[in-house]
From Swiss-Prot:
Gene3D superfamilies: Hexapeptide repeat proteins (2.160.10.10), MurE/MurF, N-terminal domain (3.40.1390.10). This is UDP-3-O-acylglucosamine N-acyltransferase. One of its GO terms (biological process) is lipid A biosynthetic process. PANTHER family: UDP-3-O-ACYLGLUCOSAMINE N-ACYLTRANSFERASE, UDP-3-O-ACYLGLUCOSAMINE N-ACYLTRANSFERASE 1, MITOCHONDRIAL-RELATED. It comes from the Bacteria. Catalyzes the N-acylation of UDP-3-O-acylglucosamine using 3-hydroxyacyl-ACP as the acyl donor. Is involved in the biosynthesis of lipid A, a phosphorylated glycolipid that anchors the lipopolysaccharide to the outer membrane of the cell. CDD domains: LbH_LpxD. It is an enzyme of class 2 (transferase). Homotrimer. Its EC number is 2.3.1.191. Pathway: Bacterial outer membrane biogenesis; LPS lipid A biosynthesis. One of its GO terms (molecular function) is N-acyltransferase activity. It holds the Pfam family Hexapep.
Length: 354
């Protein structure tokens, strides 16, 4: 890749310094003073780059790799050619992620749309709003009456913070986001165009059509949650919609009213979660999954992409398909269906039907 003008390389660290930061072991101290500035995939890592490996499938790429360091666990160290410095880590993937954050700290947050260091003159801030020291408000942002913004938080250009909203410290609200009827903890990241706290989808059928049900709950977002671009999280109807600590939500996810999501979950793009569903801690949900309202998903569940979840799921299981079922059962069903389809497509004697 050519020089990236959006994220400039780090000024450089010695490998010994990087190893200490990562809690990794630099195998050969002769390389302690080698300077590294960036992270890169093994396929194109060059001098000054750090890469990592997770399996023996990387053997061929290592033979031609020119990286200044390879992060791996002890079981894979024998794969690395002698000309490449090795850093041993019990979790190479996490160590590589930490290295990336060290080299490119600005990339850990939404891109700033201005160089403002305080409050832009064009921002609209209600006089009753309370902003702690170090809050940055970019051009054309709007902050409503009695809102509270914690120290070190950045409010992006053209974003809207509604009345009485509370946002904790060291948060990043990207350009174009809107947050109403919500309470946010510390270290929360909201990406561009996300919509937090709007009406939930609630109607009662009546003789003259659909009667709107008032949505008078809130959205509660706990510490260190990250919410992707154009994701929508509805406020509760009578109760709250809650996103648990450390949960990461991808782009274009829809979360309905009263949904309860536990701690440290990962939810991939285009997932739809209907109202009042309860999701435990550490749940991983693949892309385009649909989850029925009022179901309960246990701790540690993993759900394959494009599944349709219509019933409760027991903790710790892997599930897939529509309707959602244990993953092995789903894969077996798919294999049988494909086998039958192939058989139907053949004439006696092995000739293909037209």
């Amino acid at each position: 890749m050519e020089q990236n003008v959006f994220f400039l390389p780090h000024e450089g660290l010695k490998l010994a310094e990087l190893a200490e930061f990562l809690g990794a072991e630099l195998v050969n101290s002769d390389y302690a003073d080698v300077i590294v500035r960036s992270v890169a995939p093994i396929s194109r890592a060059r001098a000054g780059d750090v890469c990592y490996i997770l399996s023996r499938r990387s053997r061929d790429e290592l033979a031609t790799c020119e990286a200044s360091a390879v992060i791996c666990d002890k079981a894979l160290a024998d794969l690395v050619p002698q000309h490449l410095p090795v850093m041993l880590s019990s979790n190479p993937h996490a160590a590589f992620a930490m290295a990336g954050g060290l080299f490119y700290p600005a990339a850990l947050r939404p891109v700033a749309f201005s160089g403002e260091s305080e409050i832009a003159p064009s921002a609209v801030i209600d006089p009753s709003a309370r902003l702690e020291k170090g809050v940055i408000v970019e051009p054309m942002a709007v902050i409503g009456a009695h809102a509270e913004i914690g120290e070190g938080t950045r409010i992006g250009a053209h974003s809207i913070i509604g009345p009485n909203v509370k946002i904790g410290r060291d948060c990043s609200i990207a350009a174009g986001a809107s947050i109403i009827c919500a309470l946010l903890g510390n270290g929360v990241i909201i990406h561009n165009g996300a919509r937090i706290g709007q009406d939930g989808f609630g109607y009662a059928p009546g003789p003259r059509g659909m009667i709107k049900i008032v949505q008078i709950g809130r959205v509660i977002i706990q510490d260190n949650v990250e919410i992707g671009a154009n994701t929508t999280i509805d406020r509760g109807a009578m109760d709250d919609t809650v996103i648990g600590e450390g949960t990461k939500i991808d782009n274009q996810v829809q979360i309905g009213h009263n949904v309860q999501i536990g701690r440290h979950c990962a939810i991939v793009a285009l997932v739809g979660i209907a109202g009042s569903a309860k999701i435990g801690n550490g749940v991983q949900i693949g892309g385009q999954v649909g989850i029925k309202g009022h179901v309960t998903i246990g701790d540690g569940v993993q759900i394959a992409a494009q599944s349709g979840i219509m019933t409760d799921l027991a903790a710790g299981g892997q599930y897939g398909g529509t309707p959602g079922r244990p993953l092995n059962d789903y894969l077996r069903d798919v294999a049988q269906q494909m086998s039958k389809t192939k058989l139907r497509g053949k004439k006696p004697g092995g000739e293909q039907n037209d």
